[in-house]
């Protein structure tokens, strides 16, 4: 294995025999729960590719950048299909095992599953329906612009509230730091108010 994949230890491990053996044991272990497999699917499907994409962008290697774009096109298509089918097929035994194996297959440098899916499924489909997809995307974008323009007041209000919340958090942070360091806390309005209440 050469090139970019060998520079990332986790990608190099995907093609090694040790990882294959451990992976198969995890995949077919009856003790593995869906929570473990969901976490593994998220790590393999998103976490590792995010880092690989970062490395491809930082290195400036156009071949690696194209490889990651193809991966994200394949993963995005899979996620789109999964949104509509997950509730039905997740009940099948070993669903998350198969999903995990599929996500590993998409990234294996030796087989380049994402490239196979892109070249054999995604690209031909999008080339055939490009005009309709462009119309749909333009329509959705136009509607989004209308919604944003018609709700400018609400958007400004939400932005102001977020800024106010973040501002109050930033103001409280130094006082909390003083308390944590054992510094004396200066008298606040609530202390003086409690004193005036005792006088009554």
Swiss-Prot record:
Ranges in a coiled coil: none
Source superkingdom: Eukaryota
Region annotation (Disordered) ranges: 176-200
Alphabetical list of Pfam families matching this protein: TB2_DP1_HVA22
InterPro entries per the UniProt record, alphabetical: TB2_DP1_HVA22
Family indicated by similarity: Belongs to the DP1 family.
The protein's name: HVA22-like protein k
Organism, scientific name: Arabidopsis thaliana
Phylogenetic lineage: Eukaryota, Viridiplantae, Streptophyta, Embryophyta, Tracheophyta
UniProt gene name: HVA22K
């Amino acid at each position: 294995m050469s090139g970019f994949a060998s520079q990332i230890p986790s990608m190099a491990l995907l093609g090694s025999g040790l990882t294959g053996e451990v992976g198969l044991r995890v995949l077919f272990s009856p003790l593995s729960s869906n929570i473990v497999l969901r976490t593994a699917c998220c790590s393999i499907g998103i976490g590792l590719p995010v880092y690989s994409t970062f490395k491809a962008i930082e290195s400036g290697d156009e071949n690696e950048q194209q490889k990651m774009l193809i991966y994200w096109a394949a993963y995005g298509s899979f996620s789109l299909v999964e949104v509509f089918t997950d509730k039905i097929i997740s009940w099948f035994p070993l669903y998350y095992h198969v999903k995990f194996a599929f996500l590993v297959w998409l990234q294996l440098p030796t087989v380049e599953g994402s490239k196979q899916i892109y070249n054999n499924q995604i690209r031909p489909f999008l080339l055939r329906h490009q005009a309709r997809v462009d119309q749909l995307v333009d329509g959705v974008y136009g509607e989004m612009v209308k919604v944003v323009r018609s709700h400018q007041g609400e958007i400004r209000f939400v932005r102001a509230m977020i800024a106010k919340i973040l501002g109050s958090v930033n103001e409280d942070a130094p006082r909390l730091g003083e308390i944590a360091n054992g510094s004396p806390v200066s008298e606040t309005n609530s202390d003086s108010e409690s004193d005036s209440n005792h006088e009554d």
